[in-house]
């Protein structure tokens, strides 16, 4: 049994709360396609997906086929969409497990069509046409959609189940960001209209990510794709205070050692922290190998006994040191909240940690190592 005190607590009650918030933010009749890629943003895909399925989520989205297979193997029966498409040789498994995939090339279409024909399971390959409306990543360029759809008709073993796109700057609420999101929405709507003009009847139309859901400035969709908002974090600081979401993840550890140091004493690699007065230093067994960013050196904060303590010196692979001089009553064995809500009321949010680390909340949550840090599920 792993007795290391550095663990992640996942609050399923907070997940349920956030799911309910999202349901209230989308238009009536709009379903939810929960994004559970990257191990549910580090929260653990199995428990999170099982909980969301109980809540009535309409479908799940993952990044690649192996993640979709994991969902099916864990007993998830709701529709699953591979956002990043599949690779050559994966067609038969995709169809056999009744998983849908993004499609953005005729070569993919031909391979899927042939696989569906060969396995003779009397099931078409379900595809969602990915349209590049301005992200510049995956997808059929929006101006090529009419020609692509016309050529797609030659493949009789494919079912165009959905059509979707992805916003590039929906999390930026400045005039330029808003204008580009609206331009993407116009391009997407035109692609959907073209599909219908050519006789396609996609069951699912989706483009709204967490940022678009929060902004509530949506083109017509009958499916929305909440991701980070389900886990209680915000797409960007532009949405701060707009929605009472609850952090689902708490990264915690314990004080392993306390040591008084004299003025002039340096702490950790590179001597980047030097005590200017007598200080009490706590060593805590968490480090960058656990996903606690090294860039939090001399910047990060933690909560002990409801009081804040600053990281003292360079974040190590397995350890950080905290200046706990002003933490009243601190003792070896005390709980340390490194990320998420503390039982005494304060919170180290993913947004706060990301700002100090020079990154984004997504990277903070996804970066907490699953192989080193146990997940404990509550609620």
Swiss-Prot record:
Show the Gene3D superfamilies listed in the entry.
Alanine racemase (3.20.20.10), Lyase, Ornithine Decarboxylase, Chain A, domain 1 (2.40.37.10)
> What biological-process GO terms show up in the record?
D-alanine biosynthetic process
Q: Which InterPro entries match?
A: Ala_racemase (IPR000821), Ala_racemase/Decarboxylase_C (IPR009006), Ala_racemase_C (IPR011079), Ala_racemase_N (IPR001608), Ala_racemase_pyridoxalP-BS (IPR020622), PLP-binding_barrel (IPR029066)
Per the record, residues carrying N6-(pyridoxal phosphate)lysine are: 37
Provide the cofactor list for this protein. pyridoxal 5'-phosphate
Is RNA-binding included in the keywords of this UniProt record?
no
Question: What are the record keywords, sorted?
Answer: Isomerase, Pyridoxal phosphate
Q: Where does substrate bind?
A: 137, 317
- Known EC number(s)? 5.1.1.1
Annotated pathway: Amino-acid biosynthesis; D-alanine biosynthesis; D-alanine from L-alanine: step 1/1
Top-rank lineage group of the source organism: Bacteria
What are its GO cellular component terms?
A: cytosol
Q: What does this protein do?
A: Catalyzes the interconversion of L-alanine and D-alanine. May also act on other amino acids.
Name recorded for this polypeptide: Alanine racemase
* Gene source species: Geobacter sp. (strain M21)
